[in-house]
């Protein structure tokens, strides 16, 4: 009963939602709670449903809603990948799943866009981007930030990057997350609850984003 009241209190305090959230989890995290990605996706969808029910102009609702969610899983062995892919793919039953692993990209489902990137490093992404620019004959003098961003695999900037159960990050989205807010939760991924997610959102809205200034 108290837990439910506390959740309601947290919900009432959240007025500003990040438009894009990125979770960085390890293979061990996924093995401990393979269903958690689906759960977190459901929490985001529920929040968007609550916003849709509010008496707000359409533009305000779109600005307030969570528009994208990313899960980066730093590394999985081929055996682990085969074991956990069926659970990950369940996300497509409640959202639009964009799944990256190896050289494969699969898209399925509709609704909130959820990107799951397995074993993709930021260094690898930027290296591939530079290689494509060179193959296309782009001259160094023609390259600027927009040119580089146009050939990145992941073309979005997360508002907040969340790491559960630790205080270290992987090198995923090293270009895109340069101005992102960081949140380190002392709760391990397996035990990460809806109330912990709401605490992340409450903390996010209290921050003053400076975007490098």
Regions found by a protein language model. Name each.
Residues 1-213:
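Flexible, compositionally biased loop and terminal segments
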């Amino acid at each position: 009963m108290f837990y439910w009241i506390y959740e309601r209190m947290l919900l009432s305090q959240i007025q500003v939602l990040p438009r894009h959230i990125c979770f960085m989890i390890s293979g061990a995290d996924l093995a401990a709670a393979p269903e958690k990605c689906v759960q977190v996706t459901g929490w985001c969808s529920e929040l968007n449903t609550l916003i849709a029910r509010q008496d707000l102009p359409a533009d305000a609702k779109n600005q307030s809603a969570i528009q994208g969610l990313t899960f980066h899983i730093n590394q999985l062995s081929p055996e682990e990948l085969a074991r956990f892919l069926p659970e990950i793919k369940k996300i497509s039953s409640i959202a639009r799943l964009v799944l990256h692993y190896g050289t494969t990209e699969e898209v399925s489902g509709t609704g909130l866009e959820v990107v799951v990137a397995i074993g993709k490093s930021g260094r690898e992404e930027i290296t591939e981007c530079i290689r494509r620019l060179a193959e296309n004959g782009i001259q160094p003098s023609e390259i600027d930030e927009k040119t580089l961003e146009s050939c990145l695999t992941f073309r979005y900037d997360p508002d907040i990057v969340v790491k559960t159960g630790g205080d270290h990050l992987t090198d995923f989205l090293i270009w895109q997350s340069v101005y992102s807010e960081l949140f380190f939760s002392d709760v391990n991924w397996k035990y990460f609850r809806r109330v912990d997610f709401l605490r992340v959102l409450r903390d996010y809205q209290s921050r003053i984003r400076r975007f490098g200034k």
